[in-house]
């Protein structure tokens, strides 16, 4: 794993980046990369059988990584004869490591760093890269630069993700696909990879660790677990609305409620949570969060990693989505249910309770 390092050279690069500004620095990086490539053209379609080395660059955010998993797995299956290396931010690397047979280069995200020097060194250690996939719709400058400096014959990304010399093949996603994970798979489809259902599971060791954590909270192993992404609810709907929802759910006596506390809750959120008579589980690693979702029977959240994990692990979940989000991020399946909202209203609580009641009725039949 690549660790953060405080060096004089890093400081100088940050100062230089700040003085020039992102737009000028991008032009400077593009100019420095153009000398590596004789032509901006690319040979397509690619001869799949001749591909030996693939580099996949993933987004920095956990949620974006989860939305790319279907794409990644489709590509890995399609290029099963090739060596696949994934570049992934450390906090999300556990998700990728659950896919067997991959080389993973981890790094820690740093703001205001235009040239990922340590990442470049790691990529340079690889054999000649045939294809570099930049799987990000709006990649940061460091990730664009990494794709450019990979010197891959084919450097592919989404339309608008970066022109030559960073990328030499840009894909316009299939506009008939509304669900984001399927929309992302436009790249896999272009190369002949057929997106498949994700069969994803959490290591038993990690599940055992979470079971031990639940035991410490006096939650029985066989409890029917209902997890509320409490920080999301408080931030989007406020204390009063959230408290009403929690009380209504508690009255149903579904099973054991718990609060999932995501990263960096505000002081006011922490104070509110501590006043409630509900056990809470704080900021878990990516793998333990997946294990917690795996152990849960119902998740209530929104457009968040925990909701995306519920979808991947085929767990029941109810999500709150803004009107411009629900079609893209909630597929509305037998397990994933979504509610569209503008503001916190009693009607949304009523809709939520109706979905929970239907879910409870089905599980008892």
Task: Please give the residue ranges for each predicted region.
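Active-site donor-nucleotide binding/catalytic segment of nucleotide-sugar enzymes
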Residues: 52-64, 201-268, 323
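Positively charged, low-complexity intrinsically disordered leader regions
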Residues: 2-49
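Mid-sequence helix-capping/hinge segment at a functional interface
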Residues: 160-235
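Donor-binding and catalytic core of enzymes assembling or modifying cell-surface/extracellular glycoconjugates
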Residues: 116-122, 127, 240-318, 322
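Alpha-helix capping/helix-boundary segments
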Residues: 91-93, 139, 265-266, 305-306, ...
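Nucleotide-sugar donor-binding patch of glycosyltransferase catalytic domains
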Residues: 2, 6, 10, 157-158, ...
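Active-site and donor-binding regions of nucleotide-sugar-utilizing enzymes
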Residues: 52-175, 288
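Extended, non-globular alpha-helical segments
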Residues: 24-28, 32-36, 42-45, 264-273, ...
């Amino acid at each position: 794993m690549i660790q953060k390092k405080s060096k004089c050279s890093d400081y100088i690069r940050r100062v230089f980046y700040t003085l020039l500004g992102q737009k000028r620095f991008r032009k400077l990086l593009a100019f420095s990369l153009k000398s590596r490539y004789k032509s901006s053209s690319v040979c397509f379609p690619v001869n799949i059988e001749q591909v030996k080395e693939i580099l996949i660059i993933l987004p920095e955010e956990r949620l974006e990584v989860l939305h790319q998993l279907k794409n990644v797995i489709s590509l890995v299956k399609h290029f099963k004869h090739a060596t696949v290396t994934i570049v992934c931010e450390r906090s999300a690397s556990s998700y990728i490591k659950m896919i067997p047979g991959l080389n993973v280069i981890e790094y820690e995200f740093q703001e205001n760093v235009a040239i990922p020097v340590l990442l470049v060194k790691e990529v340079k250690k690889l054999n000649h890269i045939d294809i570099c996939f930049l799987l990000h719709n709006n990649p940061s400058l460091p990730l664009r630069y990494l794709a450019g400096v990979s010197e891959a014959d084919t450097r592919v990304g989404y339309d608008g993700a970066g022109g030559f010399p960073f990328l030499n093949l840009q894909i316009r996603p299939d506009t008939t696909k509304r669900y984001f994970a399927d929309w992302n798979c436009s790249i896999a489809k272009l190369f002949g990879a057929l997106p498949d259902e994700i069969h994803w599971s959490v290591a038993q060791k990690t599940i055992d660790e979470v079971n031990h954590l639940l035991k410490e909270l006096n939650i029985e192993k066989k409890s029917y677990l209902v997890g509320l992404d409490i920080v999301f609810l408080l931030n989007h709907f406020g204390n009063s609305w959230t408290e009403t929802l929690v009380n209504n759910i508690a009255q149903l006596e579904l099973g054991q409620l718990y609060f999932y506390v995501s990263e960096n809750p505000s002081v006011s959120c922490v104070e509110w949570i501590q006043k409630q008579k509900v056990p809470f589980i704080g900021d878990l690693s990516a793998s333990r969060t997946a294990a917690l979702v795996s152990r849960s029977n119902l998740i209530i959240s929104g457009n968040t990693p925990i909701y995306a994990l519920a979808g991947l692990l085929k767990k029941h979940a109810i999500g709150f989505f803004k009107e411009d989000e629900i079609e893209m991020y909630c597929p509305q399946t037998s397990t994933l249910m979504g509610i569209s909202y503008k503001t916190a209203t009693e009607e949304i609580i009523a809709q939520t309770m109706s979905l929970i009641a239907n879910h409870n009725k089905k599980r008892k039949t």
